[in-house]
Amino acid sequence: MKGMKEYIKKLEEGSDLSSEEAEAAIGEILSTAEDEEIGAFLLALRAKGEKPQEIAGFVRGMKQAGNTIKPVTPFRVIDTCGTGGDGLNTINVSTAAAIVTAAAGVPVAKHGNRAATSMSGSSDVLEALGIKVDLTPGQVRKTIEKIGIGFMFAPVFHPAMKRVAGVRKKLGVRTVFNILGPLTNPAGAKGQVVGVFDKKLCEPIAYALAELGTEHALVVHGDGMDEISNTGETFVAELKDGEVSTYTITPEAMGMLRAKPEDIKGGTPKENARDLLCIFKGQKGPKRDLVILNAAAALYVSGIVGSIRQAIPIAEDAIDSGKVMVKFNQFRNFTAELSIQGKKEGSCPGEAFLASSDTSVLSPASGEKA
């Protein structure tokens, strides 16, 4: 069996690792490898460039080393997650889009972490909104099944990642770990919208997702953002039915006005939380349009509509009808109850809240409760 030294040598020679070798390497990195070996491996891989089978192997290895859940849901579970690192400091688009998507009836297993390069990460803004993010895996599964949305806080689900934190900080450059987060969804989401900080990553990540068994995914880079953009063109690598295709979309093609970058700027977690609440309550403008575009993409990969454009009215209605605020309040209240009382083994302390609330999932495709 090969070890880290062999993997490092192979990478330094410019050769690609097989998916199995990549999986074994990440297993060593997250367990027994020395810091010097980890640093050399990451730098050699960065110099060579990551290939789809390597990315897929790393993802498998990370999932093996972490915690996973299998929520039972009426529809395909989806995730909206970006790599971050675009340096544009927008509002928390994928987090807002996740709540809108859940309000439209699609179960969401949102994966995220604290801010690394921006002022506000997904967990930061959720905490500012009063949502508990440090739930156990079992509690998150209950939240997805009962409410239709759950947040999987990366340190809870990938505790072994703390082994590489020091090395990554010391290296001071982007490594493969900067792109693995959105791909290691602990709930095994089969539909994904993945935002990336570099257009060149779109196709390799789409092919990696294909190898990992993802059913439908959009890997996007929009006008410098790790989101679908309403300020310019968005490059998309779409994985569907095992095939990857690429194309570009514009705000105008989606029936939306083109915005200016300053119109969608974010701020601190509290400032972004305020912006998200305004959007949820129906305030119109470029920030709402940006959230709707990305929620529509999530609805598309869920399989309930045939295109992003077809999903836009569904996302708009979820906000304007008040469903989004209802879903947000359910999410906040249920996670609060679980956080306070959920340590009792085998109990589901949110049942009292559920009994007094209409939390049934409404299918936008049929209008029937499921």
Curated annotation (Swiss-Prot):
GO terms, biological process: L-tryptophan biosynthetic process
Cofactor: Mg(2+)
Signal peptide limits: none
Keywords from the UniProt entry: Amino-acid biosynthesis, Aromatic amino acid biosynthesis, Glycosyltransferase, Magnesium, Metal-binding, Transferase, Tryptophan biosynthesis
Binding site for 5-phospho-alpha-D-ribose 1-diphosphate: 82, 85-86, 90, 92-95, 110-118, 122
Residues the record lists as binding Mg(2+) 1: S94, E227
Pathway per the UniProt entry: Amino-acid biosynthesis; L-tryptophan biosynthesis; L-tryptophan from chorismate: step 2/5
GO CC annotations, alphabetized: cytosol
Enzyme Commission identifier(s): 2.4.2.18
Co-factor remark: Binds 2 magnesium ions per monomer.
InterPro entries the record matches: Anthranilate_Pribosyl_Tfrase, Glycosyl_Trfase_fam3, Glycosyl_Trfase_fam3_N_dom, Glycosyl_Trfase_fam3_N_dom_sf, Nuc_phospho_transferase
Catalysed reactions, semicolon-separated: N-(5-phospho-beta-D-ribosyl)anthranilate + diphosphate = 5-phospho-alpha-D-ribose 1-diphosphate + anthranilate
Binding-site positions, Mg(2+) 2: D226, E227
One GO molecular-function entry: magnesium ion binding
Keyword set includes Transferase: yes
Binding site for anthranilate 1: G82, N113
Record's function text: Catalyzes the transfer of the phosphoribosyl group of 5-phosphorylribose-1-pyrophosphate (PRPP) to anthranilate to yield N-(5'-phosphoribosyl)-anthranilate (PRA).
Record-stated family: Belongs to the anthranilate phosphoribosyltransferase family.
Known partners and oligomeric status: Homodimer.
Protein name: Anthranilate phosphoribosyltransferase
